[in-house]
């Protein structure tokens, strides 16, 4: 049966990609606040199965399917996204001070490749506005992470100050914090992958975290464009600092085998072209860490099979952004149902039993 989104999508795709996103965000906000609608939306989308539950660093996830950072930069869509059945929502990237990001147009669909290119550039309302939005949210049964970054005009040698400021402001009201050093759209940011800079940043954040009354899990979001040696150095630095997870991966600068005329646009590529590379990075990290700390897999997930193969490669949790643009609001439900079928088919009694089996084999 044709879904409602399949009928609406051609209309949305006639709009500029960011304009369509803004309309979607508005619809989510309205839906979450309207009388009776939240109950109806939950009935349609909030399917759960105990087989899919995941525990990580003291947090209990009803299911492994989350929303990747970038979809909700203002932290004002949490209530709406929670209605769609996601197990966690990562808001941001959040910078200390408000900044507009790069000039529009800065978000592009590549339908021939089931992909997006973005050069948003950390457009953010700033940490004060995000803190206000997080305190105002109604949904308390969904895990909320905060992805943090630096302001564009902050010199790289002072980047630690930006991460510290945002961490101090937001960690106490988030369930976990993700450190974004891998966006390709902030000049020089990926230089923080260099071991000395990364060690300084992570050790300062973990020091501050230990001083909190209730320390939060810290995850490190990594680039898909590192060489094997560079990736290993990043993983070693993260492990030495005691981070709680790696998020693999961010968007890529690679442009391999694309068919869309918009492939020439600058920015980070996400979606189907990233699927295999993200899975390779997930597997590489899992081999290095043996799953401790775990991997949160993101990149090119649009179906239950995509999610299952990321999990088999080593991901304990997964995140979606581009897949939702193409598949619509039922994507979390559809992936969860497909995952449960695959886990039972293959004889697993929990999702966590399937994590990394492809690597272990």
Swiss-Prot record:
GO terms for cellular component: cytoplasm; plasma membrane. Disulfide bonds: none annotated. Catalyzes the conversion of dihydroorotate to orotate with quinone as electron acceptor. GO terms for molecular function: dihydroorotate dehydrogenase (quinone) activity. Pathway: Pyrimidine metabolism; UMP biosynthesis via de novo pathway; orotate from (S)-dihydroorotate (quinone route): step 1/1. The gene is pyrD. It comes from the Bacteria. It comes from Roseiflexus sp. (strain RS-1). FMN binds at residues 69-73, 93, 147, 180, 221, 249, 271, 300, 321-322. Keywords: Cell membrane, Flavoprotein, FMN, Membrane, Oxidoreductase, Pyrimidine biosynthesis. PROSITE patterns: DHODEHASE_1 (PS00911), DHODEHASE_2 (PS00912). It is a peripheral membrane protein. Binds 1 FMN per subunit. The active site is at 183 (nucleophile). Its EC number is 1.3.5.2. Its main location: membrane. This is Dihydroorotate dehydrogenase (quinone). It is found in: Cell membrane. Pfam families: DHO_dh. Monomer. InterPro entries: Aldolase_TIM (IPR013785), DHO_dehydrogenase (IPR050074), Dihydroorotate_DH_2 (IPR005719), Dihydroorotate_DH_cat (IPR005720), Dihydroorotate_DH_CS (IPR001295).
